[in-house]
């Protein structure tokens, strides 16, 4: 369960940015992420919707913006909601609707969605398995990715399937102590409490 008391959108955005810089880019979990971040082409949006329908309206808006904006101006979007999806099961159920939104906005084959959640868990793993941290984030997050960007990045990383295996091996080598040393706000290993001074 996510403790989201006393949060504001600026704090949520900053925590997400630190996760992006320290884990996704810092550990090179996604080799494609650094370039757009350095070029300031990553949009972080914190939804304040009070219900699912409102969140899906925010998703529609961000999908349309991404679809109508050149990649040279906006490469990718992180849509974050700190309170609406407190458990992974609820979040996971929403993903099918989110994928439908891509189709409804006529962006199938153009944009895809990658999910991240504080309690993300791959099928067949234990909750505290370090491999789950490839997709764990401070808050429930939808990463809206241009498929053209993925194809372009794949040219530089032809063995893209090896990235996941490399990430798992890296996290297993780091272990929970190594992960916690990254000091990512609201994203500690399960048996640790989040730092109160974040």
Question: Can you annotate each of these PLM segments?
Answer:
Residues 2-198:
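Expand to "…catalyze enediolate/carbanion chemistry for C-C bond making/breaking, isomerization
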């Amino acid at each position: 369960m996510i403790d989201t008391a006393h949060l504001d959108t600026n704090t949520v955005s900053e925590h997400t940015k630190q996760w992006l810089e320290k884990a996704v880019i810092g550990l090179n979990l996604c080799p494609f992420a650094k370039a757009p971040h350095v070029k300031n082409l990553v949009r972080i949006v914190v939804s304040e919707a009070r219900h699912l329908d409102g969140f899906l309206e925010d998703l529609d808006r961000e999908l349309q913006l991404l679809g109508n904006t050149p990649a040279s101006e906006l490469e990718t979007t992180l849509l974050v909601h700190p309170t609406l999806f407190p458990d992974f099961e609820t979040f996971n159920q929403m993903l099918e609707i989110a994928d439908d939104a891509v189709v409804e906005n006529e962006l199938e084959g153009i944009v895809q969605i990658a999910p991240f959640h504080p309690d993300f868990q791959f099928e067949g793993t234990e909750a505290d398995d370090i491999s789950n941290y490839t997709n764990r984030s401070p808050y429930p997050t939808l990463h809206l990715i241009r498929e053209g960007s993925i194809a372009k990045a794949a040219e530089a990383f032809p063995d893209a399937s090896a990235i996941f295996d490399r990430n798992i091996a890296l996290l297993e080598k780091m272990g929970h102590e190594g992960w916690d040393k990254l000091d990512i706000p609201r994203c500690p290993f399960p048996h640790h409490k989040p730092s109160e001074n974040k």
